[in-house]
Amino acid sequence: MARLRYLGHAAFDVELEGFDGRKRRILLDPWLENPLSPVKPSDYRGARVDYIFVTHDHGDHLGNAVELARATGAKVVAVYELAEELSKEGVQAVGANIGGPLALEGIQAVFTPALHSSSKGAPTGVVVRGRDTAVYHAGDTGLFGDMRLIGELYAPDVALLPIGGHFTMGVVEALKAVELLRPRLAIPMHYNTFPEIRADPEKFKELVEATTRTKVVVLKPGDYVEYP
């Protein structure tokens, strides 16, 4: 079982049941100073967070990862070069690379390719798997054919996909991503934070549900969904 709370832009607060039956709390791309965020970094002071995953080093994804790691004691998981830089900030950082399965405490993860840019290490997406649910956060990415392979190999139940265009996939490209990944649930992200990434999540929902078997849930910042 998974509980996913949308924190605006590309940030999520996720609870997964671990392989040992214990819940693990995970933050994904935690830019909590985004203009849509319902929470502030200070709201996490003293909270239990196990892992913070960062898909790449752009400020709207790396966000408040260091501050949150210091406040919660969470380990930051990122591509190797970025993790090395973060460790210099005094946080516990786990470095990995694309395609290398990670066995973490109670959960598994693997970084996936992403078509984007990044100054420190390659841009990535990430699949995080608990006892009975796998969540794919695509990071910032354009559409690419190996999303089909991600679907076949890692079978994500939930896909968190950017739809805002300009820097990432737009609605049409994200629809094709759903066709390739074949998740049971898709949640749009990375839209309407700035004028450049205006998009209609309801149009995405309409297209996906009309042409695939995937359900789309459009979350407002602060809302959450439970899966299954």
From Swiss-Prot:
UniProt-recorded Gene Ontology molecular function terms: hydrolase activity
Pfam families membership: Lactamase_B_2
Keyword match DNA-binding: no
InterPro entries assigned: Metallo-B-lactamas (IPR001279), RibonucZ/Hydroxyglut_hydro (IPR036866), UPF0173 (IPR022877), UPF0173_UPF0282_UlaG_hydrolase (IPR050114)
Domain of life (superkingdom): Archaea
Matches recorded under SMART domains: Lactamase_B
Keywords: Hydrolase
Family the UniProt entry places it in: Belongs to the UPF0173 family.
Protein name from the UniProt record: UPF0173 metal-dependent hydrolase Tpen_1493
Organism: Thermofilum pendens (strain DSM 2475 / Hrk 5)
